[in-house]
Amino acid sequence: MASPLNNGRKASEIFQGQALLYKHLLGFIDSKCLKWMVELDIPDIIHSHSHGQPITFSELVSILQVPPTKTRQVQSLMRYLAHNGFFEIVRIHDNIEAYALTAASELLVKSSELSLAPMVEYFLEPNCQGAWNQLKRWVHEEDLTVFGVSLGTPFWDFINKDPAYNKSFNEAMACDSQMLNLAFRDCNWVFEGLESIVDVGGGTGITAKIICEAFPKLKCMVLERPNVVENLSGSNNLTFVGGDMFKCIPKADAVLLKLVLHNWNDNDCMKILENCKEAISGESKTGKVVVIDTVINENKDERQVTELKLLMDVHMACIINGKERKEEDWKKLFMEAGFQSYKISPFTGYLSLIEIYP
């Protein structure tokens, strides 16, 4: 008869394992809580309350018009979100509890320039969420991605055929690009000496516009899928071009790849990088490729950052057959694509800036 204590473990260890198991079993509630507060505009309500002052629970449920029969449940949701760092519980008038925004929930204020609310709406969209229910089936199917198994078509084909999903995706990528405005303030050196740059896969041009505003003399071109840029207009130093990065990338002093390469497997990345090398090979002496992407480093990163990067790797691998990479993976790609050297610099909390030289 097997021992009730697995492999001789202490009862305390087993109960710790149970707690970890249950935490992850209920982990899906985390993202649903985010969706709930974004759909109800709770960050916006707190942001606009008395010029951003904390809001009491009674004031919040009154604005939300929550029935008395559901106030306890709503309070549980708010308490859980506060515990996870999305709200701060403070004491105001006569020691009454109130909710204030944190750095995380400020990013979900829809009226904010740095709002990531569209990212929440995109990731928790039914097609994206539903695909994960097909993991078991995916293992034994020929299709490389759970997205393909779930919807019967590759991600990029689906996004081109579904206007609503395409719009949600582009809005999510655009709001993520706005965050770069903060990072680029400390990275002006990246663009010094350049006269032209191509933002490959640059979406609706948010990143390119940020660069153009910071460097008015720098000519910037956005290369994107034709259906994304067909109705977009440029400016004096910004142009939009519909094309295919797997076929040809316009000539420039530099090529920018922001969160592009993690979408693709190594063979596809090789094709993109080879085209980048061709694009920057000319008379310019400053030719380089600028990659903004994830570099996994489990030995140096904080646990929370590592967990995010590994989760992103799972997401990219299963949804579109993409990949988050360690430095040795990046080096192998760069060298095999014909580049001679590279330099990795910190960029944001989880992203790195990599300069690659031919």
UniProtKB/Swiss-Prot annotation:
Keywords: Methyltransferase, S-adenosyl-L-methionine, Transferase. SUPFAM superfamilies: S-adenosyl-L-methionine-dependent methyltransferases, Winged helix' DNA-binding domain. It is an enzyme of class 2 (transferase). GO terms for molecular function: flavanone 4'-O-methyltransferase activity; O-methyltransferase activity; protein dimerization activity; S-adenosylmethionine-dependent methyltransferase activity. GO terms for biological process: biosynthetic process; methylation. The active site is at residue 262. Belongs to the class I-like SAM-binding methyltransferase superfamily. Cation-independent O-methyltransferase family. COMT subfamily. This is Flavonoid 4'-O-methyltransferase. It comes from Glycine max.
